[in-house]
Amino acid sequence: MMKKAEDPLQDREGTIQEHTEGQAGTAAADQSAAVETPESRIAGLEREVQAEKEQNGKFRDELLRRAAEFENFRKQKEREAVMASQRATDNVLRDLLTLVDDVERVLANVPEPEEIPAAAKPYIDGVELLKKNLDRWLESKGVKPIEAIGMKLDVDFHEAISQIEHPDAEPETIVEQYQTGYLLGDRVLRHAKVIVAR
């Protein structure tokens, strides 16, 4: 008996068909596994939202911290600039006070009016005018002299350079002023140098 010759083409078609059916079955299984339920999709999205909120919170905290650091830095630089300006102003005013002291010494040594020669009178008037203008300018800048004579010694405002016997004054009372002290606003620009009674 002769066997019927197998058709190679039919074998191939059968194999292809079996393979295709197998792939279709696997794809269907994968597809059914890949299809999410609405609940699982919502749960996944909620997890993502929560993770984003946490990340957003971290970024927000970092931003607030950096903003606070910058604000503190800015305020510190402003304070430093104000202090530097204040120191520069104080130094200029202190230097100017030595000029005021010199003018006061000149005026303190002016002879009595009847002893002043006529030729010297305009110069003395000029020095007096200079003193008035200096005092007016200092006052416009907030600089004022510290009261001293007749006051009790206050080390915050006065510097005692000597003590003397003075029958008409109580102890620690200022009886003479050697150098005028000045305030700039409420700060001591220069202490008054004074002589106090024992």
Curated annotation (Swiss-Prot):
InterPro entries cross-referenced by the UniProt entry: GrpE, GrpE_coiled_coil, GrpE_head
Protein location: Cytoplasm
Keyword Acyltransferase among UniProt keywords: no
Domain of life, per lineage: Bacteria
BP terms from Gene Ontology: protein folding
Keywords: Chaperone, Cytoplasm, Stress response
One term under GO cellular component: cytoplasm
Main location: cytoplasm
Sequence segments annotated as region (Disordered): 1-56
Residue spans of biased composition, Low complexity class: 22-34
GO molecular function: adenyl-nucleotide exchange factor activity; protein homodimerization activity; protein-folding chaperone binding; unfolded protein binding
Keyword Repeat belongs to the record: no
Annotated CDD domains: GrpE
Basic and acidic residues biased stretches: 1-21, 44-56
The family this protein is said to belong to: Belongs to the GrpE family.
Assembly description: Homodimer.
Record's function text: Participates actively in the response to hyperosmotic and heat shock by preventing the aggregation of stress-denatured proteins, in association with DnaK and GrpE. It is the nucleotide exchange factor for DnaK and may function as a thermosensor. Unfolded proteins bind initially to DnaJ; upon interaction with the DnaJ-bound protein, DnaK hydrolyzes its bound ATP, resulting in the formation of a stable complex. GrpE releases ADP from DnaK; ATP binding to DnaK triggers the release of the substrate protein, thus completing the reaction cycle.
Name of the protein in question: Protein GrpE
Species per Swiss-Prot/TrEMBL record: Chlorobium luteolum (strain DSM 273 / BCRC 81028 / 2530) (Pelodictyon luteolum)
